[in-house]
Design a protein with these regions (language model features):
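A transmembrane-helix-recognition feature enriched in membrane-embedded lipid enzymes
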Residues: 2-57, 87, 102-111
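A generic secondary-structure micro-motif detector
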Residues: 30-31, 93-94, 119-120, 127, ...
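Short, flexible loop segments at the rims of nucleotide/cofactor-binding pockets, characterized by
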Residues: 43-49, 68-70, 116-121, 151-153
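Soluble or luminal CAZymes and related metallo-dependent hydrolases
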Residues: 32, 36, 121-122, 214
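Catalytic core of membrane glycerolipid acyltransferases/transacylases, capturing the structured
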Residues: 60-120
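Short amphipathic alpha-helix with an adjacent loop that forms part of the alpha/beta core around
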Residues: 57-61, 131-132
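Non-catalytic C-terminal accessory region of glycerolipid acyltransferases
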Residues: 2-25, 124-238
Length: 238
């Protein structure tokens, strides 16, 4: 997903793609959809999941473009991220099939979803769009697990592409984690588990390694942070 500082009304914030149509944060439809998302979904998420945020947005790392990763555990996790990073325009690099999920997929497409190409030659427009966004100070969000598994409590195997792309463009990476936490009523009765987004410390690209070795080291650092945060559920909150 690309997270970018919302530059509506300026020359920035636009990234073209032949894969999912043209994304333009200045177009009325995008602005209407974003307004609806930010005014409707936060209270719904709080009511259904007790949705909350742990950590802080590292704005100092987002000024010149960066890349974030998050586990993929809910059909509307992209909307949850959009609500948390509400001062930013968001674009999502995701499996093409995820962009066609009923309702959720339509929202992602309208918000700037980028479908992973099925063929190698399809990467050219994708990388062009990513570079344009990063050059404008945007933030690319990728789901390294690839497949969406609703309600998954474990951290699944990562695909290397997210970390290779980060090393290619030499941008810092911001790991995020969606996790479930126990909730109780005032009387002490167990309620449906809540959801929280944990924003972890940004990780810079290794300077002493290049290529696949740099990507592997970056993946190891990111996974360690995310796994530690997953196991820390219940010991921290916002």
């Amino acid at each position: 997903m690309i997270l970018v500082k919302d530059r509506t009304g300026s020359k920035n914030g636009t990234a073209d793609s032949t894969l999912v149509g043209v994304f333009d944060s200045k177009r009325p439809l995008y602005r209407i959809v974003k307004w609806l998302i930010l005014h409707i979904f936060p209270p719904v998420f709080r009511l259904l999941y007790g949705f909350r945020v742990v950590g802080r947005i590292p704005e100092e790392k987002m000024q010149n473009g960066c890349i974030s990763v998050c586990n993929h555990v809910h059909k509307l996790d992209c909307v949850m991220l959009a609500c948390v990073f509400q001062d930013y325009t968001m674009q999502f690099l995701s499996l093409e099939s995820n962009l066609h999920i009923l309702v959720a997929g339509a929202i992602v497409r309208l918000m700037g979803g980028i479908g992973l190409p099925a063929k190698l030659d399809g990467w050219r427009p994708v990388l062009k769009r990513i570079k344009q966004g990063l050059d404008e100070g945007q933030m690319l969000q990728i789901y390294p697990e690839g497949e969406l598994i609703d309600g998954c409590r474990t951290l699944r195997a990562f695909q290397p592409g997210a970390f290779q792309i980060t090393c290619w463009f030499r941008k810092p990476m911001i790991p995020c984690l969606l996790r479930f936490y126990p909730r109780f009523s005032k009387s002490g009765r167990r309620k449906r588990d809540g959801m929280e987004l944990v924003i972890l410390e940004p990780v810079d690209i290794p300077t002493d390694k290049k290529g696949k070795r740099a990507a592997t080291e970056l993946e190891t650092q990111i996974r360690c942070q995310m796994e530690a945060a997953r196991l820390a559920v219940g010991r921290e909150g916002a």
